[in-house]
């Protein structure tokens, strides 16, 4: 338990409020660069991965100077970021509302360090699951695992929702360059029957493997979709004994798994200390291991492990994810920014913003502190994004000339997996990556607009205020190790935010109420009687649905 109730009680928070009024509110990044030729060197860090690959994190275009950053670091120390971080890595129950450890970092403990939780070491248990995943994924990839007619598997369908879907979807898309030709992965998450129907309509039951991803094996959407998939399969296979060759479970509920018809040998478990939004590192990542191969999946884990060690051992003033989190707090709580933009200049990363939405907004979308009092300050930001250059032709107008401050992260790899046309496409992509962050910073003033020939009432329409903050993240190449490090960077950034706001970033009570009400309404939809048990709007909507349903 932190020693403070509210972040606003911290002495450094009050000092930062004064600093914002005296310096931050009028801070000019352009002027800061003009005054300090070494600003880029002072506010950028090169992260070195376990395989010697590198990622450059450039924070120099943000609205801070050294004094402000020093104050933010002091705030982190006062808030106990280091203490909470160390408690997480020690396996303590920092998820206080559910009395659980938060130990996803143990899932990528490839150095097999001692990482006990509740008096039990996790290293061997995690390694055993990974060995099982390797054996299974290798057998799918080499064709030795066959379906009920003796044919090799060509299509793997992961059925899950939330963290059991978003992580595997994002990672398989991001690492598609490492996939095996002829082996495809598909994902079903939405309870909308269209998602299941469209996914299955071109698949062959004889060569399809289903992975049912549900920790409890009772998640309503997942089990409904899984049952529909089983019925689709049995319509061709006929005999339920064939389920064993075509279904595996990523779950901890052996009783329900076996009752479904899945062989217990094809069940891959994980512990209660694995939160859904952090579960891609666990057995939930089996679809990833099958798609890109276990060695690449292991590199993915090791990349995350390397960022974990950086976060755990690096002083806060040079700690890359901590700095990212501190900047987020600075904009959110002192500038009043409500959103954060993430733009990957990489088509393979097109699902990365959606993945980060869950990580950030489910973790820090809280209004009660760990001291059980309501906050008197903003917490979780609204995170959004799309890949560039597409994004430049949609919402970048608002980012450049709108009335809202939208801090942004831009992500680019120097080396493309597809350097077509003598790398012309990648150089064009890179030129936009560099140009957008520069344009957001420098803007365009009235004099320059007039110098370019604009006159009269057109002039203000072509002005750009600039001074819009960006963080540029430049990797050498998007490899499994690089992606692992990038995800872990955002995990620990999110952790830092939550620690400063003194909220529990590891529960998600907000998703429960709607699910409970949906069960009640689901029963009401089973008959044709008009309902009158809700508010007038909900009654009206339900009754109109019943009238139009058939």
UniProtKB/Swiss-Prot annotation:
Q: Where is the active site?
A: 362 (proton donor), 393, 515
Where does the chain bind D-glucose 6-phosphate?
Answer: 163-164, 214-219, 358, 362, 393, 515
Q: What is its EC number?
A: 5.3.1.9
Per the record, the pathway is:
Carbohydrate degradation; glycolysis; D-glyceraldehyde 3-phosphate and glycerone phosphate from D-glucose: step 2/4
Q: State the Gene Ontology BP annotations.
A: gluconeogenesis; glucose 6-phosphate metabolic process; glycolytic process
GO MF annotation, one: monosaccharide binding
Instruction: State the reactions this protein catalyses.
Output: alpha-D-glucose 6-phosphate = beta-D-fructose 6-phosphate
- Keywords in alphabetical order: Cytoplasm, Gluconeogenesis, Glycolysis, Isomerase
Q: Does the keyword Lipid metabolism apply?
A: no
| Enzyme class label | isomerase
- UniProt-annotated location(s): Cytoplasm
Q: Which family does it belong to?
A: Belongs to the GPI family.
Q: State the function annotated in the UniProt record.
A: In the cytoplasm, catalyzes the conversion of glucose-6-phosphate to fructose-6-phosphate, the second step in glycolysis, and the reverse reaction during gluconeogenesis.
Please, what other remarks does the record include? Answer: Has antigenic properties. Elicits a specific immune response in systemic candidiasis human patients undergoing malignant hematological disorders.
Quaternary data: Homodimer.
Q: What is this protein called?
A: Glucose-6-phosphate isomerase
Source organism of this protein record: Candida albicans (strain SC5314 / ATCC MYA-2876)
